[in-house]
Design a protein with these regions (language model features):
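Carboxylate-rich, polar loop motifs that coordinate divalent cations or form catalytic acidic clusters
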Residues: 1-185
Length: 185
């Protein structure tokens, strides 16, 4: 049993070789990338999927400046669209990674308003359907051990190594975050 995001057709729920559901704005909190209510419009863009340690499926909707760009699906099937002020103007997201403690790191490929790409970090504190206790942070600049700014303009990928360090692939080379769980505070 698994889910597949698509760049136009929404979210698919699959078991074996059988498609159980296709989620679109008609049956889930997704929105179309542009204003077109036609059911044949191929503009429901769901990407950046990851599971957290509680079994919640997190997804980012891209393209078209979606007001509620994050969607979570809890293990019981409840889905909710979520927004944070720092990502309301994001036009395209990259990969998302959930740390073992539940903190999520989401790459920003294109921010329309100011052009600042970077990493959005958020922690739902174990209450994915309630944002009142959430912590979040947008990071567009990193600093190395000597205090020198790493002037990355593009962020490509994320990986967690066996020691718990987070690696971010950028146009300026790799960035290593030694303690990513505490980076949000």
């Amino acid at each position: 049993h698994y889910f597949v995001g698509s760049w136009g057709e929404g979210l698919y729920e699959i078991q074996g070789r059988l498609i159980l559901n296709r989620y679109t704005p008609d049956n889930a909190p997704f929105v179309r990338a542009w204003d077109n209510d036609s059911p044949t419009a191929h503009n429901v863009r769901v990407g950046s999927l990851c599971y957290d340690h509680r079994g919640n499926l997190w997804m980012a909707q891209g393209q078209g400046l979606v007001a509620n760009p994050l969607v979570v699906r809890t293990p019981d099937g409840t889905m909710k669209a979520i927004s944070y002020p720092d990502i309301e103007l994001v036009n395209a997201f990259g990969p998302m990674l959930a740390l073992p403690n539940g903190v999520k790191w989401l790459l920003i490929y294109h921010r329309s308003a100011d052009g600042n790409n970077g990493v959005f970090i958020f922690d739902d504190k174990g209450t994915p359907l309630d944002q009142s206790d959430d912590e979040y942070r947008l990071v567009s600049k990193f600093v190395d051990r000597t205090g020198k700014e790493i002037a990355a303009k593009r962020y490509y990928d994320l990986a967690l190594d066996p020691s718990g360090s987070l690696w971010i692939a950028t146009d300026k080379g790799p960035i290593c975050v030694a303690n990513p769980s505490s980076f949000i505070s």
